[in-house]
Structures are given as structure tokens and as C-alpha cells.
Amino acid sequence: VYIDLFLMSQILFTPKVIIRGYISPKNNIQYPKNVFPITFSIPEEKILTSVPIKKKMMSTLIPWNKSTYIFNTEDAYYNEYRNSMFGLTCLKAGWDCMRHYELMANGCIPYFLDIQECPKNTMFLLPKDLLIKGNELYFKYHNTDITNTYLLSECNHHIKNLLDYTRQHLTTKAIANYVLQKTNHEDVNKILYIGTEQPDYLSTLILHGLKIKFGTNCHDIPRQNHIYKTEHGDISKIWGK
């Protein structure tokens, strides 16, 4: 699929417009047997172990409105999602985005615009059935008081399912295992990871998973300094605020 990036920059940047540049879910590509889909992931320690208490129905964070990006620390950002029953997310420059994983990991139901338009092999490992169910719950309850018994029962059960799925399938270690399994390297005990010094979500997250799995037997060349606690650089500039 060819997308003219200059043309895309000249037109209104909305999910619906961008979607038109992507493959329809009804026309999915059949990839060669040695090409596999992949997704982002999230460190297991970032995933809540229980459903958090909710204080409001919808998060004030709007993905396409940077004036709502008001949080300067990870804790403040995560607490916004923990306090919210639903959080808005959508396709922007691409389908995959850390926000989807951060929502699920913090016990916030993604209200995912146009998720039904996502191609089968894109965000392949995400629980699209649960995401569609989350949209249905939003439409069912968005005008309901946050203390409503039926709302809490049904939505909290759904959040538990999202947390369980994220912990089982979407951790950095789980995706690292997926890469090793698909490339027939499940039995290796040492890794040489050749990447880039610059932060990149997919590359860095896979490296994190391999580091968790192999420890000092995973060597990154060049060294990705931003993932190490011993480094003291300003990491506040490496995320997409």
C-alpha cells in the first residue's frame, strides 16, 4: 500500500482520513510464511494486579488534542487512567500506539474509535474482541452515574479480563518470546541485539523483553542508554508528549 506522506500532511488529520490510506479489514494481505505480524508491548511491572477504584467515567486525555497532554510524570499520567472508567484512543499516524497498552495496563477500558476498521494482521496480538466489547460498554453506560451497581459489575469484570490478557500476552517478555518462537530461536541462551541508539518503541520494547529474559546474556549494540537505570540523562524528552 502506497501512502503519499506529503499529500497526507496537506489534508485534515483525523482518524477517518488516515484510515482511508490503510488496507480494509475485508481485504487482508496474505503474507509469506516467513513474515509475521508484531505489536508493541508493555513491561509487566507497569500492569496493575487489581481493578482500581474509579472516580470518573471518561479520561480528559484526547489523543489528537495536545492541550490535554498536561501530565509531566508517569505517575500522574497513569493515575489519570486509573481514575477513569474509559479512555479514548484511536488510529493516528499508525494503528499501534503505546496509549492502547497504557490504558489496559492501568485498568482503564479503551474507547477505541473505529477499531472494527483495523486490518486483521495489524495489532495482531491485541484483543480486538475485548476492545470492541469495551466500545459497546461505553455506549451502554456513558450517561450512567459512575457509582451505578450494574455499571461497576460489568465494567470491572471487563477490566479484569483486559488486565489478565495484557499480563499474559502483551508484556515485553511475552513479545520477546513470540519473536524467538516465530524465528525458531527458542533454545538460544545468548542474544546480540543490533539496533539504534535512538529511542524507538518497537525496538526498545523488544530489547527490554529480551533483557528481562536473558539478563546479562543479552547485549545491545549500540547500547540503548535510555533503558538503563544507571544512566542519568533526561528521559523526559523521549516520549510522545
Residue ranges and their predicted role:
Residues P25-N27, P32-S50, I212, T216, ...:
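Contiguous N-terminal and early-domain "leader" segments and peripheral loops that mark the onset or edge
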Residues V1-N65, N143-C155, K160-E186, G195:
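Catalytic core of nucleotide-activated saccharide and alditol-phosphate transferases
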Residues Y69, T73-E197, Y201-F214, C218-W239:
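Catalytic binding pocket for nucleotide-activated donors in carbohydrate/polymer assembly enzymes
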